[in-house]
């Protein structure tokens, strides 16, 4: 899982750099640019620190996928709405799927989707300029999360079946080797 953590950190770094550059290009060097970029960079620092802490892989994975997602919502709120920023959450959903663990997807998608619904009532611009657009984005995110969860669940089941079949083959190989050894001794 360590390799997935590191790969996801690189994705976060690339996203922070990209969003910082596009923020400066969009808003110039203003107060909201500094605040927005500050949230992004603070999130990167938090995620990097957690990577080196002695905590479970599950906790690391949750911090790696949830912190950037919440940071994007905060960022969007600080720059007074950014309809493109929400799309970055599809990247964090993909990062959650890379762990190939339905538990991580579930514990990521449910609270984040609920937070997005709350954002609709705080400031719809955090998600999208229009209420209908925000609803659409949240529904698409939730549907994607459900489909990816179900796909991962199916994949986990097939992996367990393949492992069981491999174990059976290894047992059969051991029996065949013992029989061959005994026949050769006679």
Region spans (language model):
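Hydrophobic transmembrane alpha-helices and their membrane-interface boundaries in multi-pass
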Residues: 5-81, 88-94, 112-116
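Membrane-water interface at transmembrane helix exits
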Residues: 51, 76, 123, 152-156, ...
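A helix-boundary/kink motif common to multi-pass secondary transporters
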Residues: 56, 100-101
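Alpha-helical transmembrane segments and their helix-entry boundary regions
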Residues: 61, 97, 104-106
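Interfacial aromatic-anchored transmembrane helix boundaries in multi-pass membrane proteins
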Residues: 74-81, 116-138
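Short hydrophobic alpha-helical segments that form membrane-spanning helices or hydrophobic packing faces
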Residues: 107-111
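HAMP domain helices
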Residues: 131-186
């Amino acid at each position: 899982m360590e390799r997935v953590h590191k790969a996801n950190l690189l994705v976060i770094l690339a996203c922070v750099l990209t969003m910082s550059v596009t923020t400066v290009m969009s808003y110039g060097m203003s107060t909201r640019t500094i605040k927005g970029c500050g949230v992004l960079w603070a999130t990167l620092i938090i995620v990097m620190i957690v990577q080196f802490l002695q905590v479970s892989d599950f906790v690391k994975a949750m911090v790696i996928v949830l912190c950037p997602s919440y940071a994007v919502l905060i960022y969007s709120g600080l720059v007074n709405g950014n309809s493109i920023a929400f799309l970055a959450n599809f990247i964090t959903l993909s990062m959650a799927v890379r762990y190939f663990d339905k538990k991580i997807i579930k514990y990521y998608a449910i609270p984040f989707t609920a937070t997005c619904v709350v954002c609709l009532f705080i400031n719809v611009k955090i998600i999208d300029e229009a209420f209908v657009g925000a609803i659409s984005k949240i529904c698409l995110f939730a549907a994607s999360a459900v489909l990816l969860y179900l796909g991962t669940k199916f994949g986990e089941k097939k992996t367990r079946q393949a492992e069981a079949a491999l174990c059976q083959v290894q047992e059969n190989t051991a029996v065949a080797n013992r029989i061959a050894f005994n026949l050769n001794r006679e």
